């Protein structure tokens, strides 16, 4: 299995790792690397929900280098025999922002499959209750004890005396099954007799306890180093009154939209930005933590037309859409300004109340460029539609 970076990725590996260490301190990675566990940490606020940290134990277990893992989604370790039901359990847990523990068949870089106990939990920001990361611990399932038990129970099902990895489903009985660094030959009879009694590999109680202890150790490190940075995290959600909480499922859905846009909450004081797309960060030169919580006027400068700002304010107060051309300022090295073709539109909830405003930006220089697919105005309306669908279909977390 060879991993390659997607050409659509906005973030470099360094930027993806910075998005993680920015909440803590520069020493967080060194502290995490001292832990003996196999685990990864992902960031749902980055498009594609990529891995932003991988432990040395995880890299050794899978055979990949850190450069091959950082920036990738965890699904790249799955394969043709990975149980789809287990994957749906994990996705559902992410959507509901809760912990989950399942047995999972993953694949090493060499292509060999292995069973593991997958234990994932969310990490919440203590100030706003939003999910900041997901921690996933992977404990290899040995299966020895279960193997012996199964052999005794199903010994009369087949005359074949070759060793069978009884704790695993037939769907993975091919080639060599690697267990605890030892290759065990696995042979399966084509006869289906008795196979319905075979179960998916189940972790022992000690392996489940090991996963729980590992999660607690990782969380302890994250909490400690977040205290040093002043941006506290915790393993439980603490929502402050008046602070908007976007579910991670909504954040992931919004991350699939590749255009430049921001989402603001008109119900909060000063209508702050609560989501900024990767393309917006590229256009303006700002980092995500510099944008969230700001009012959109932070992009304005000395030469920004105040009458345009007033027009935008009036439309927002009336709950109406508007399209303007406004001079904005970037955070690039040259602090350059750019003409922004900005479309603002309300996003309503199921009851018809305005829940958010979406602002879609197109650099005006692109307006005169021949675009084969869609005109800028059409692209903006497409983004608005995609945001509305994401908001209405995602599970919203209410504080």
From Swiss-Prot:
FMN binds covalently to cysteine after exposure to blue light and is reversed in the dark. Residues 26-97, 249-320 form the PAS domain. Keywords: Chromophore, Flavoprotein, FMN, Photoreceptor protein, Receptor, Repeat, Sensory transduction. The modification S-4a-FMN cysteine is found at residue 296. InterPro entries: PAC (IPR001610), PAS (IPR000014), PAS-assoc_C (IPR000700), PAS-like_dom_sf (IPR035965). It holds the Pfam family PAS_9. PROSITE patterns: PAC, PAS. GO terms for molecular function: photoreceptor activity. The keyword Glycosyltransferase does not apply. GO terms for biological process: response to blue light. Residues 98-153, 320-376 form the PAC domain. Interacts with VTC2, VTC5 and BLH10. This is Protein TWIN LOV 1. It comes from Arabidopsis thaliana. The gene is TLP1.
């Amino acid at each position: 299995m060879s991993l390659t970076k997607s050409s659509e990725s906005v973030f470099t590996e360094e930027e993806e790792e910075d998005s993680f260490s920015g909440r803590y301190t520069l020493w967080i990675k060194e502290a995490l690397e001292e832990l003996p566990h196999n685990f990864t940490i992902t960031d749902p606020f980055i498009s594609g929900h990529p891995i932003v940290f991988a432990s040395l134990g995880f890299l050794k277990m899978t055979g990949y280098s850190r450069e091959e893992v950082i920036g990738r989604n965890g699904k790249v370790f799955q394969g043709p025999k990975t149980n789809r039901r287990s994957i749906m359990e994990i996705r559902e847990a992410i959507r509901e922002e809760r912990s989950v523990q399942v047995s999972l068949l993953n694949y090493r870089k060499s292509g060999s499959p292995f069973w593991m106990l997958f234990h994932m939990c969310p990490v919440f920001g203590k100030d706003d209750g939003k999910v900041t990361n997901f921690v996933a611990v992977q404990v290899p399932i040995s299966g020895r004890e279960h193997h012996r038990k199964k052999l005794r129970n199903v010994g009369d099902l087949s005359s074949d005396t070759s060793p069978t990895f009884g704790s695993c489903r037939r769907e993975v009985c091919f080639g060599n099954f690697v267990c605890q660094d030892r290759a065990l030959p696995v042979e399966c009879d084509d006869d289906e007799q008795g196979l319905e009694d075979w179960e998916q590999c189940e972790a022992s109680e000690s392996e489940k306890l090991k996963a729980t202890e590992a999660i607690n150790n990782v969380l302890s490190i994250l909490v400690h180093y977040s205290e040093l940075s002043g941006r506290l995290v915790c393993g439980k959600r603490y929502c402050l009154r008046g602070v908007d909480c976007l579910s991670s499922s909504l954040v992931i859905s919004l991350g699939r939209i590749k255009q430049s846009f921001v989402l603001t909450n008109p119900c909060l004081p000063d209508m702050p930005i609560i989501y900024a797309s990767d393309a917006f960060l590229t256009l303006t030169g700002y980092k995500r933590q510099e944008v969230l919580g700001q009012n959109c006027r932070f992009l304005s400068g000395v030469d920004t037309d105040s009458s345009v700002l007033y027009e935008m304010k009036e439309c927002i107060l009336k709950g109406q859409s508007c399209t303007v051309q406004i001079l904005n300022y970037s955070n690039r090295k040259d602090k350059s300004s750019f003409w922004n073709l900005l479309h603002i539109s309300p996003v309503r909830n199921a009851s018809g109340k305005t829940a958010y405003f979406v602002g879609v930006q197109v650099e005006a220089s692109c307006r005169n460029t021949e675009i084969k697919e869609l005109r800028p105005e059409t692209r903006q309306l497409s983004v608005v539609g995609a945001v509305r669908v994401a908001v209405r279909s995602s599970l919203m977390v209410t504080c």
